[in-house]
Every structure is written in structure tokens, then in C-alpha cells.
């Protein structure tokens, strides 16, 4: 059964990791998908893979900086122009963001982190909701948050604070958009084997009930449920896909502290741009 037959979806951060896996899954379930990313090389590579699977008639790509309002407006317009409407938005684009001690983080890098991690969620929702309000069946907005946004000690400061904002945004937007049958939900991944966490995956073994690292398909399957009509009565929630990691917050903080200690994160400062194609700049702090 194709669970998204004839629905139209926009997915940001679609060139790799969770976004790529979700785009492929949505296409396999009958959706028309606009894939957005700021990494031109990996975006085109992903579209080539879609062509190989003979799914390209239901897909198109859009080079997008999710922190730029005009780019988001263009992205949503593309979905409507190509496929007639917009039913699903998956705000998934992200970066590691500014890292380092609070006393040394660069303010511009802090702002840039929030632009990509949080402002993008607002912008995507703003323009998607304008279209979804016209739909008889409303729509589904799905936002990638993180377990780092649920408490202290489980991620870099800027990243964690921005993801906490994503979770709260979902709750408030769900209340506002509910009367229009627009559902707004978040997914908080735990340790997922993606390009953004590749180093951590190699260096760590987290203490959690399900003793394994998650895969992008685990998040994609959750997004598929939230995008489908099966979740028609669910809004404003945050689903943790983390192998039970957050069930023991003390263990989570201990594991995170050990991981960041191994990375020497308290001794470096800079900006982790993830898989955007923009070089990360991280420097050692002077003693």
C-alpha cells in the first residue's frame, strides 16, 4: 500500500542522511517530492539515484539556503508550480553549529546556527501553511528536533538551545494551525548514523536500552507516519527515536560528557557546517 499516494512533499536537507532516506521513502510511497539542499554536489547525486530508481518523474530538486526567506518562498512556489499544491513539509536541514565554551563562542556563528536550525523551521512553516490553509485536508509539517533540545548536557550549547526552540515551536504552531487541519510535529533523533554524527558513531557506544545506533531509515519511517493520514489526529508532539536513550537522563549526560571530552570540545571553538558543502572551521583554544 502506498501511504502517500499523490501527496506533495517538500524536504529540506534532502541531499544526504535522514533527508535523503526520507525523500526516497516518500517517493516509494507515491508522493511527489521537492528535494531541497544547499549542497549542490550531493543534491545532484541524490537526484541521479532517484533517476536510477525510475522515480524522477515525481521529483525535482531546488538549491536552497533554508535561512534565506526568498529561498524558502521559491521552494514552496516550486512545489505548487510543479505538482499543484503542498501537503507535507519536512523541515530537516541542519548543521552542528557553533561549538566551544560559552565564554568563547563567536556571536555571529551563534546567530548563523540559529538561522539554519530554528529560523528555517519558522520560514518553512510560514510559507507551507499559506498553501496548506487552502487544502480541504490541511497538511502535515514535520520538524527535525533532537534529544539535545530536551535537557542539559546532551549536545553543544547553540545546537541544543536551537533544537529546544524547535520543540516549543511545534507546540505553539500546532495550536495556531490546528483549526486549519494542519498538523505540526517534531521528531527528536538520538544517535543516528548520519554524516553529521559519523565521527561520534565511530568513537562511541552509548549505554541505552536498545544497544545499537539508529539509521536514517528509522527517522524516515517516523516521518512517513507523521506525513500520512494515519496520524490525522496527532499534533504538537515530539517523538523520540533514540533507542530509549532519554529514558535515563543521568546516563545520557554521562555518555555525552564522555563523548565531548574525547572530542576535546571544551578546548576548541568554531563552526560545524555538517554536510552542507561549506567547510567547517574549528580551532584550538589558546591555553
Region locations from a protein language model:
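Residue(s) in the substrate-gating loop at a strand-loop-helix junction
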Residues: 146
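Alpha-helical segment proximal to the catalytic Tyr-Lys
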Residues: 130, 175-179, 232
Amino acid at each position: 500500500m502506498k501511504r502517500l499516494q499523490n501527496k506533495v512533499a517538500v524536504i529540506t536537507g534532502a541531499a544526504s542522511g535522514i533527508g535523503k532516506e526520507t525523500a526516497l521513502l516518500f517517493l516509494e510511497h507515491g508522493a511527489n517530492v521537492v528535494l531541497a539542499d544547499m549542497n549542490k554536489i550531493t543534491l545532484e547525486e541524490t537526484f541521479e539515484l532517484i533517476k536510477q530508481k525510475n522515480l524522477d518523474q515525481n521529483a525535482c530538486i531546488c538549491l536552497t539556503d533554508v535561512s534565506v526567506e526568498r529561498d524558502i518562498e521559491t521552494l514552496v512556489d516550486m512545489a505548487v508550480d510543479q505538482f499543484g499544491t503542498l501537503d507535507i513539509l519536512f523541515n530537516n536541514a541542519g548543521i552542528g553549529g557553533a561549538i566551544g565554551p560559552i565564554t568563547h563562542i563567536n556571536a555571529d556563528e551563534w546567530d548563523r546556527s540559529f538561522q539554519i536550525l530554528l529560523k528555517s523551521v519558522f520560514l518553512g512553516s510560514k510559507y507551507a501553511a499559506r498553501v496548506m490553509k487552502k487544502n480541504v485536508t490541511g497538511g502535515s509539517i514535520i520538524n527535525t528536533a533532537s534529544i539535545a533540545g530536551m535537557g542539559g548536557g546532551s549536545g553543544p550549547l547553540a545546537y541544543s538551545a536551537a533544537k529546544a526552540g524547535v520543540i516549543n515551536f511545534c507546540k505553539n504552531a500546532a495550536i495556531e494551525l490546528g483549526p486549519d487541519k494542519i498538523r505540526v510535529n517534531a521528531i527528536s533523533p538520538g544517535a543516528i548514523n548520519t554524516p553529521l554524527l559519523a565521527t561520534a558513531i565511530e568513537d562511541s557506544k552509548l549505554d541505552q536500552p536498545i544497544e545499537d545506533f539508529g539509521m536514517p531509515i528509522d527517522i524516515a519511517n517516523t516521518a512517513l507516519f507523521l506525513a500520512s493520514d494515519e496520524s490525522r489526529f496527532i499534533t504538537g508532539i515530539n517523538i523520540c527515536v533514540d533507542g530509549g536513550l532519554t529514558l535515563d537522563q543521568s546516563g545520557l549526560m554521562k555518555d555525552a560528557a564522555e563523548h565531548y571530552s574525547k572530542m576535546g570540545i571544551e578546548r576548541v571553538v568554531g563552526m560545524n557546517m555538517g554536510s552542507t558543502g561549506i567547510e567547517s572551521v574549528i580551532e584550538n583554544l589558546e591555553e
